UniProtKB/Swiss-Prot annotation:
InterPro entries with a match to the protein in the record: Expan_Lol_pI, Expansin, Expansin/allergen_DPBB_dom, Expansin_CBD, Expansin_CBD_sf, RlpA-like_DPBB, RlpA-like_sf
Keywords for the protein's UniProt record, in alphabetical order: Cell wall, Cell wall biogenesis/degradation, Disulfide bond, Membrane, Secreted, Signal
GO biological process: plant-type cell wall loosening
A GO cellular-component term linked to this record: extracellular region
The keyword Ribosomal protein is assigned to this record: no
Record-given protein name: Expansin-A6
Ranges of residues in domain Expansin-like CBD: 171-256
Disulfide bonds: C49-C77, C80-C156, C85-C93
Gene this protein is translated from: EXPA6
Subcellular location: Secreted, Cell wall; Membrane
SUPFAM superfamilies: Barwin-like endoglucanases, PHL pollen allergen
Annotated organism of origin: Oryza sativa subsp. japonica (Rice)
Chief subcellular location: secreted
UniProt signal peptide: 1-22
Length: 259
């Protein structure tokens, strides 16, 4: 019979392996990449994930708009991918086999007026990354325009904790979740207000995804300290207790713990 310590280590390795498989870690897949947004990536701001200014949110220029096959109707927002150029290394790819890791921050819509191999790069079922230009130039030459790539899901490395920006008004609370480490994407969000005597006081209430990574609650939360429970795409959950104090205001951002 194996010693208890060895059994514990084996169990931990099994859990880690399952999480890695859930993220698709190590599973290189074929796709294509183009670029947009200009040399400073200013044209990538905003986007279908709702992150707004990608500089101030910490995503910088290492970002990508995903095609329909990858975007998953917005549930992939915040996920991270490692890409390497797989084209003609003399004409398209940079030498040395460099890779770049990007965060999904936008949607690359299909263009059915053009064929998939002639301008409709993001048409289903193509797995396509429209990279911020600086990210593209880390693996390929500008003149290439479009290159075949190999890609895989990877864990997201973030500085600081998960951030919650509370927008909206009384009875309509729209919470933007950013800077999520690990899986990066958010599959569910719940809110709990402090105290008791209301629908959310002292108990968890699920929020519904409005768009991108904006999550909605129609409860009256004013004057209550807010706790959030985040469940990521790999099934892991994180509770950030009383992350917003009772005197919070709409438009403020609060930072909690990290995965």
């Amino acid at each position: 019979m194996a010693p208890p310590l060895l059994l514990l280590l084996a169990s931990l390795l099994l859990v880690a392996a399952r999480r890695a498989l859930g993220l698709g870690l190590g599973q290189w897949q074929p796709g294509h990449a183009t670029f947009y947004g200009g040399g400073d990536a200013s044209g990538t701001m905003g986007g279908a994930c709702g992150y707004g200014n990608l500089y101030s949110q910490g995503y910088g220029t290492s970002t990508a708009a995903l095609s329909t096959a990858l975007f998953n109707r917005g549930l992939s927002c915040g996920s991270c991918y490692e890409l390497r150029c797989a084209g003609d290394h003399r004409r398209s790819c940079l030498p040395g086999g460099a890779t770049v890791t990007v965060t999904a921050t936008n949607f690359c819509p299909p263009n059915y007026a053009l064929p998939s191999d002639g301008g409709g790069w993001c048409n289903p079922p193509r797995r396509h990354f429209d990279l911020a230009e600086p990210a593209f130039l880390r693996i390929a030459r500008h003149a290439a325009g479009i290159v075949p790539v190999s890609f895989r899901r990877v864990a997201c490395a973030r500085k600081g904790g998960v951030r919650f920006t509370v927008n909206g008004h009384a009875y309509f609370n729209l919470v933007l979740v950013t800077n999520v480490g690990g899986a990066g994407d958010v599959r569910s969000l719940a809110v709990k207000g402090s105290g008791s005597g209301s629908r959310v006081g002292g108990r968890w209430q699920p929020m519904s995804r409005n768009w991108g990574q904006n999550w909605q609650s129609n409860a009256y939360l004013d004057g209550k300290a807010l706790s959030f429970r985040v469940t990521a795409g790999d099934g892991r959950s994180l509770t950030c207790a009383d992350v917003a104090p009772a005197g919070w205001q709409f438009g403020q951002t609060f930072e909690g713990r990290q995965f």
